[in-house]
A protein has these predicted regions:
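Signal-transducing coiled-coil linker helices
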Residues: 4, 14-53, 61-73
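Conserved nucleotide-binding and Mg2+-coordinating catalytic segments in signaling enzymes
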Residues: 45-65, 79-93, 98-101
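Short regulatory alpha-helical coupling segments
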Residues: 46-47, 58-76, 104-112, 130
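Active-site-flanking beta-strand signature of metal-NTP-handling nucleotidyl enzymes
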Residues: 75-80, 117
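Alpha-helical scaffold within the catalytic cores of cyclic-nucleotide enzymes
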Residues: 104-105, 136-152, 185
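A short pre-motif secondary-structure segment
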Residues: 116-119, 123
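Catalytic core regions of nucleotide second-messenger enzymes
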Residues: 119, 148-164, 192
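Catalytic-core segments of nucleotide cyclases and related cyclic-nucleotide turnover enzymes
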Residues: 138, 142, 169-218
Length: 218
């Protein structure tokens, strides 16, 4: 028996409403998932954009941003592995990559949050050591140097050792980041000129201990 017209209209309206609700719900869920996926993808991209692929540390760009945002009570250290090219030449670039990752692990161990660690490129690294006193920050950085010097790495049946030279400068609100960086870079040059595998602070002149240098300028 045919359905009365009024009932058919009511059924049609009900079905349309149900179908519309289903479509709207499905569309809403789909859109929400797509937005979430895009947000996750963007976050991953931003993370990867700031990370050095080999070491897992921050890259130079992210380190520069961190330095710009550090306004004081911190030390900047610029470090360079000694004779790194000879490792690549003697053992191959895979061995060099292995050394870079091992050094990065040490940096992360001794200079994790709130400190900042980065691979600036090649065999060069950057650190921003926060808080404490100048002397304590210097001692932490030198602990990193000694730990790297003590490394004995086994790679492809061969034993590899390395060392690192470090230049340190002080960050303060009165100094522009590029000025601090240049001071740390000059200190690094002096560390390399002094025979490498050492740490030189911008306040240090010749063999004068850092503690005496700090007292002289305080």
């Amino acid at each position: 028996m045919p359905m009365p017209l009024i009932d058919a209209v009511k059924l049609s309206v009900a079905m349309s409403w149900l179908l519309g609700s289903f479509v709207a719900t499905f569309t809403g869920v789909f859109v929400a998932r797509e937005i979430r996926s895009l947000a996750i993808a963007k976050a991953k991209y931003e993370h990867l954009r700031r990370i050095d692929g080999l070491s897992g540390l921050l890259n130079r760009r992210a380190f520069s941003e961190a330095l710009d945002q550090t306004d004081g009570n911190a030390s900047l250290a610029i470090a360079e592995l000694d004779w790194f090219k000879s490792i690549n030449d003697a053992y191959g670039h895979s061995a060099g990559d292995f050394v870079i990752r091992a050094v990065a692990d040490i940096l992360c161990h001794f200079a994790n949050d709130p400190h900042v660690t980065a691979r600036l490129g090649g065999e060069e690294f950057g650190l921003i050591i926060q808080g404490d006193t100048i002397q304590q920050r210097f001692e932490r950085i030198d602990m990193i140097r000694r730990s790297i010097s003590d490394l004995r790495l086994h790679f492809d049946g061969r034993l590899i050792s390395t060392s690192i030279s470090i230049g340190v400068a002080e960050i303060s609100p009165e100094r522009r980041p590029e000025v601090v960086y240049a001071a740390a870079d000059r200190a690094l040059y002096r560390a390399k000129a002094n025979g490498r595998n050492c740490i030189v602070h911008e306040m240090t002149h010749g063999p004068q201990p850092l503690k005496q240098s700090i007292q002289a300028v305080s």
